[in-house]
A protein has these predicted regions:
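Membrane-embedded catalytic scaffold of the fatty acid hydroxylase/desaturase
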Residues: 1-124
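Cytosolic-facing loops and C-terminal tails of multi-pass membrane proteins
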Residues: 121-219
Length: 219
């Protein structure tokens, strides 16, 4: 949801990945985050238990923001580790919108958003629409400004709604694409190139058969 992403983008807009990034958080997240947790108390769980769990998660998330811890073997089967969080902060096409888990990666694996770090790919940290400013208010609000500018592109209220609450990158005219659309376009292009390559290979005359035909004609 782009409106929520506009608050969280502050955390991702740094082109560095270190412990400083861990405490780089948007002010507006306090508006929506409580809604993700209040139902736990409403179900009857003690508030103290929730606070302790959130504290443990925050500490784990803090120390994940480092590039100096290698892959951790077996525990990566179910725990969200440092290399996985590097993937989460990358703006490489193959890494975007991956590894959302706080401590466990079980749900990422279940819903297809888990991605292992490929050490042969150089990671580019940050976001595709950076604030390009050191002004704190620009950093905090630049994506909200982008949403407003996009909403003015169409008079259709459904389009306006999607610009605010649809996935980041959505556009009514195809001028920008979501990460899902980008991946689908890349995959379609790769498949097309593969088919063309196969057709070229199949239509290429066999050199041995060609030589035999030439010799037959000479004879």
């Amino acid at each position: 949801v782009r409106f929520f992403w506009a608050a969280h983008i502050v955390h991702h807009s740094s082109d560095n990945f270190n412990l400083g990034t861990a405490v780089r958080n948007g002010w507006f997240t306090i508006i929506y985050k409580p809604f993700f947790y209040v139902w736990i108390v409403m179900l009857g769980f003690p508030p103290e238990m929730l606070i302790v769990c959130l504290g443990i998660e925050s500490l784990w998330q803090f120390q994940l923001h480092t590039k100096y811890v290698p892959k951790l073997g077996f525990i990566e089967k179910f725990i969200n580790t440092h290399t996985m969080h590097q993937v989460h902060h990358a703006k490489n096409i193959e890494y975007m919108d991956k590894n959302h888990g706080g401590i466990l990666n079980i749900f990422d694996r279940m819903f297809g958003t888990w991605k292992e770090l490929d050490e042969n790919i150089e990671i580019a940290y940050g976001v595709t629409t950076p604030p390009n400013s050191y002004n704190i208010f620009t950093i905090l609000t630049h994506e909200y400004k982008n949403i407003w500018e996009d909403m003015k592109k169409s008079k259709n209220w459904k389009h306006k709604f999607m610009y605010a609450f649809g996935p980041p990158g959505w556009s009514h005219d195809g001028s920008t694409q979501t990460i899902k659309q980008i991946r689908e376009s890349i995959k379609a292009t790769e498949n097309k190139n593969k088919i063309l390559k196969n057709d070229t290979t199949q239509n290429k005359p066999n050199q041995k058969e060609t030589v035999v035909e030439v010799l037959s004609e000479i004879g």
